[in-house]
């Protein structure tokens, strides 16, 4: 989800993802027509636990 994405970006780049990625590509805002399909995907995603020990995502092991 978006919060997990932001956390991953913060860990890897030391930057907050939202100011950098909300204007990335063709983003017309939450609920905008061009992003309707993309926004709907977030309701269908699975949330799971992960860690970044040794910079290896534990879910990839």
Swiss-Prot record:
Pfam families: Phospholip_A2_1. Disulfide bonds join 28-35, 41-59. GO terms for biological process: arachidonate secretion; lipid catabolic process; phospholipid metabolic process. It catalyses: a 1,2-diacyl-sn-glycero-3-phosphocholine + H2O = a 1-acyl-sn-glycero-3-phosphocholine + a fatty acid + H(+). It is found in: Secreted. The keyword Secreted applies. Ca(2+) binds at residues 27, 29, 31, 39. Its cofactor is Ca(2+). Belongs to the phospholipase A2 family. Group II subfamily. D49 sub-subfamily. Snake venom phospholipase A2 (PLA2) that displays edema-inducing activities. PLA2 catalyzes the calcium-dependent hydrolysis of the 2-acyl groups in 3-sn-phosphoglycerides. This is Phospholipase A2. It comes from Crotalus atrox.
């Amino acid at each position: 989800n978006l919060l997990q994405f932001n956390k991953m970006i913060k860990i890897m780049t030391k930057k907050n993802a939202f100011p950098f990625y909300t204007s990335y590509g063709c983003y017309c805002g939450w609920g905008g027509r061009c992003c309707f399909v993309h926004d709907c995907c977030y309701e269908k995603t699975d949330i799971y636990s992960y860690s970044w020990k040794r910079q290896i995502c534990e879910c990839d092991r």
